[in-house]
């Protein structure tokens, strides 16, 4: 098994409900270690930059408005197969389809307000980590 890093974000719907600790506890219980973390309130421009891959999708405006509507927690997680493990712990994007015990099944309000974001591949993990963190902010 490979030790890798992934990007994780706790979204505004979850921070508003004080779920940061509960979500982080689920990630840590799955064997993921937080090696960088900060609380940020994205500007609309930052949200548009972070989600630029979706700029031509019909939900882009709603997504970026939501992501800039309150604080988020951006994190770098480390562990064996961290990308796949994080996605497993998060659950399906649509909470109605998420497995019991996953973050989205337990905490998400809707498909849009689904509490967390996580990288889907090593390349996106590297890009998303670099968007929010400098190398000196990541302490393993």
UniProtKB/Swiss-Prot annotation:
Summarize subunit and interaction data from the UniProt record for this chain. Homotetramer.
Q: Which GO terms describe its cellular component?
A: cytoplasm
Location in the cell: Cytoplasm
NCBIfam families (UniProt xref): PRK00668.1
Q: What does this protein do?
A: Major role in the synthesis of nucleoside triphosphates other than ATP. The ATP gamma phosphate is transferred to the NDP beta phosphate via a ping-pong mechanism, using a phosphorylated active-site intermediate.
Q: Which residues bind ATP?
A: 11, 59, 87, 93, 104, 114
Catalytic reaction annotation: a 2'-deoxyribonucleoside 5'-diphosphate + ATP = a 2'-deoxyribonucleoside 5'-triphosphate + ADP; a ribonucleoside 5'-diphosphate + ATP = a ribonucleoside 5'-triphosphate + ADP
Gene coding for it: ndk
Q: Please verify whether the record's keywords include Transferase.
A: yes
Taxonomy-wise, where does this protein's organism fall, top ranks first?
Bacteria, Pseudomonadati, Pseudomonadota, Alphaproteobacteria, Hyphomicrobiales
Q: Which PANTHER family match?
A: NUCLEOSIDE DIPHOSPHATE KINASE (PTHR11349)
User: In the Enzyme Commission scheme, what number(s) does this protein have?
Assistant: 2.7.4.6
Tell me where on the tree of life, at the top rank, the source sits.
Bacteria
Q: Any idea what this protein is called?
A: Nucleoside diphosphate kinase
InterPro entries recorded for this chain? NDK-like_dom, NDK-like_dom_sf, Nucleoside_diP_kinase, Nucleoside_diP_kinase_AS
């Amino acid at each position: 098994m490979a030790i890798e890093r992934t990007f994780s974000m706790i979204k505004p719907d979850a921070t508003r409900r004080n779920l940061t600790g509960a979500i982080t506890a689920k990630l840590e219980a799955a064997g993921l270690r937080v090696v960088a973390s900060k609380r940020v309130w994205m500007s609309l421009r930052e949200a548009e930059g972070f989600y630029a891959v979706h700029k031509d999708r019909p939900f882009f405006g709603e997504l970026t408005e939501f992501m800039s509507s309150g604080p988020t927690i951006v994190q770098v997680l480390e562990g064996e197969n961290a990308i796949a493990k994080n996605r497993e712990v998060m659950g399906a994007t649509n909470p109605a389809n998420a497995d019991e015990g996953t973050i989205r099944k337990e905490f998400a309000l809707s498909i849009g307000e689904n509490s967390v974001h996580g990288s889907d591949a090593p390349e996106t993990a590297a890009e998303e980590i670099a968007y929010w963190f400098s190398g000196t902010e990541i302490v393993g």
